[in-house]
Amino acid sequence: RLVLDLYDQVGKATDEPRVVKHSQETRKGRDVVIAIDAGHGGDDPGAIGRKLKSKEKHITLSIARKLKKIIDKQPGMRAILTRDGDYYVGLRKRMKIARQHHADLFVSIHADAFRSPKAHGSSVFVLSRRGASSEAARWLAAKENAADLVGGVSLDDKDDVLASVLLDLSQTGTQAGSMSAAAKVHREMGRIGRQHGKKVQQAGFMVLKSPDIPSMLVETGFISNPGEERKLSSRKYQQKMADTLFKGINAYFQAEPPVGTLIAMKKHGPGQKSAKYVIKPG
């Protein structure tokens, strides 16, 4: 088996004591970054309501903006939007935006639709194992031409075996984080309305495929259901939805704050232990 010890800014041992100067950001801890993805946009309206003809792209953007306002008011938290207007952003571009901002969590907001107007309830999705496997194959196939980092490590100068191990390690941790965050959001969603799925569901949605960012996709309700369309079109309910999403997101970061963040320092103190991962055969 292979044991990797990952340390947060550990220097080489020396015989002489040395003075370490930390930046102000290091001393106070960085913000956790949440990438909020408003589904669809521009020429892609998403689902359209049966009665009010509400467009999914407008509902998702409104909820995303409200959620960002809530997050940005919290000490140690910051949100970025993958789109902040009525324009289309490609699915992989959405992932790229999140990675460029070093996001700690990716939340994609949608409104569901079905041919039957009786379908109802919210759902929360994370990436399926099959989807993760296909994405891993894509990353490994393209690693020679990629300068992207996975979990802070470049794959382009690693041999195939080591690159595969590092990618698998990153994906395993990411999927665990995705499920943990999604479960907390799913629980909060159940407190404000009916749910289409009794538990977090798994699917191969493209926007969930970042190998190093915990990600979830939230279906806020069925826009094809007249009753839920009416609620989703209401500014009051959109605010309620944003508040609910924040509660789940905040619960996740309070329970599992990333190392080096202000939330982690408040919880554990400045001295944080390394994280140890054990890779077992098979």
What is each PLM-predicted segment?
Residues 2, 34, 122-125, 206, ...:
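A broad, low-specificity signal marking well-ordered, structured residues that form hydrophobic/aromatic
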Residues 12-162, 171-183, 187, 230, ...:
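Catalytic-core regions of hydrolytic enzymes
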Residues 1-16:
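Extended, charged alpha/beta regions that create polyanion-binding interfaces
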Residues 4, 115, 166-268, 281:
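Active-site-adjacent mobile loop/cap segments within catalytic or ligand-binding domains
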